[in-house]
């Protein structure tokens, strides 16, 4: 997992590349946490019954740790941007009857999470 901070004191990004899951299945979970406060997203990921929650949960914790340790954010955080992009897919062949074969595509995806501080009221 890669992390970067392009804009100082504004946002923290965390990337996970080549996760061995379909982007469509990961988007189902990312739509649930987008725009929510960190604590609420943490609880949602802990209890949602999808396999895609685990890598997103790890990535969210990594981004929060970077916000605390590298950027010294002390206020509440929220998920400002959460996106999933398709990555390369590897092809495997499944051999069938009568000399035929079918192509099986093993899909991967890239996940990006951006955390920001909640604006002061």
Swiss-Prot record:
Record's Gene Ontology CC terms? chloroplast; large ribosomal subunit
> What task does this protein carry out?
This protein binds specifically to 23S rRNA. The globular domain of the protein is located near the polypeptide exit tunnel on the outside of the subunit, while an extended beta-hairpin is found that lines the wall of the exit tunnel in the center of the 70S ribosome.
Name the chain's protein.
Answer: Large ribosomal subunit protein uL22c
Give the record's subunit note.
Part of the 50S ribosomal subunit.
One Pfam family assigned to this protein is Ribosomal_L22
Q: Which GO terms describe its biological process?
A: translation
Query: What InterPro entries does its record include?
Result: Ribosomal_uL22 (IPR001063), Ribosomal_uL22_bac/chlpt-type (IPR005727), Ribosomal_uL22_bac/org-type (IPR047867), Ribosomal_uL22_CS (IPR018260), Ribosomal_uL22_sf (IPR036394)
| GO MF annotations, alphabetized | rRNA binding; structural constituent of ribosome
Similarity field: Belongs to the universal ribosomal protein uL22 family.
CDD domains xref list: Ribosomal_L22
Q: List the disulfide bonds.
A: none
State the source organism's domain of life: Eukaryota
The gene for this chain is rpl22
List where in the cell it is found. Plastid, Chloroplast
Q: Which Gene3D superfamilies match?
A: Ribosomal protein L22/L17
Entry keyword set: Chloroplast, Plastid, Ribonucleoprotein, Ribosomal protein, RNA-binding, rRNA-binding
């Amino acid at each position: 997992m890669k992390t970067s901070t392009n804009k100082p004191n504004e946002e923290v990004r965390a990337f996970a590349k080549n996760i061995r899951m379909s982007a469509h299945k990961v988007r189902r979970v990312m739509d649930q946490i987008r725009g929510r406060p960190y604590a609420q997203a943490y609880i949602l990921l802990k209890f949602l019954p999808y396999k895609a929650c685990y890598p997103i949960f790890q990535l969210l914790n990594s981004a929060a740790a970077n916000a605390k340790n590298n950027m010294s954010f002390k206020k509440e955080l929220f998920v400002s941007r959460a996106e999933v992009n398709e990555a390369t897919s590897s092809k495997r062949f499944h051999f069938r009857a009568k000399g035929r074969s079918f192509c099986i595509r093993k899909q991967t995806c890239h996940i990006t999470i951006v955390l920001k501080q909640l604006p002061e009221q």
